[in-house]
Amino acid sequence: MLKLFAKYTSIGVLNTLIHWVVFGVCIYAAHTNQAMANFAGFVVAVSFSFFANAKFTFKASTTTMRYMLYVGFMGTLSATVGWVADRCSLPPIVTLVTFSAISLVCGFVYSKFIVFRDAK
């Protein structure tokens, strides 16, 4: 299981880079607001995460149901962490680091035992 987690973590690093690049392009090139930029970054990064983890981490097929389960869970997790951060007036960097840590662990457990539970 540690080997799987290491693969999942590697893809997570790429996800973070993708999210930040899309966010930056939206803010500085497309001149969107932060909410739109963050949403766009999330959608692109979480989609990459799903397909990359299905292929390289879990060696599983991709289905619409699996995609919806994964994106729905990660989106809910993201919104919840953001809501709590707003309620607690946390600085954005604290929110980012907190979400990164929580999503890494929770996303891995959810993927292994729910989304890709029947993968070999």
Curated annotation (Swiss-Prot):
Top-level taxon of the source organism: Viruses
Subcellular location(s) per record: Host membrane
Membrane topology value: Multi-pass membrane protein
Family assignment from sequence similarity: Belongs to the GtrA family.
GO CC field: host cell membrane; plasma membrane
InterPro entries membership: Glc_translocase_bactprenl-link, GtrA_CellWall_Glycosyl, GtrA_DPMS_TM
Role this protein plays: Involved in O antigen modification. Involved in the translocation of bactoprenol-linked glucose across the cytoplasmic membrane.
Example of a GO biological process term: polysaccharide biosynthetic process
UniProt-listed PANTHER family: PROPHAGE BACTOPRENOL-LINKED GLUCOSE TRANSLOCASE HOMOLOG
Principal location class: host cell
Segments crossing the lipid bilayer: 10-30, 34-54, 65-85, 90-110
Cleavable signal peptide: none
UniProt keyword terms in alphabetical order: Host membrane, Membrane, Transmembrane, Transmembrane helix, Transport
Protein name: Bactoprenol-linked glucose translocase
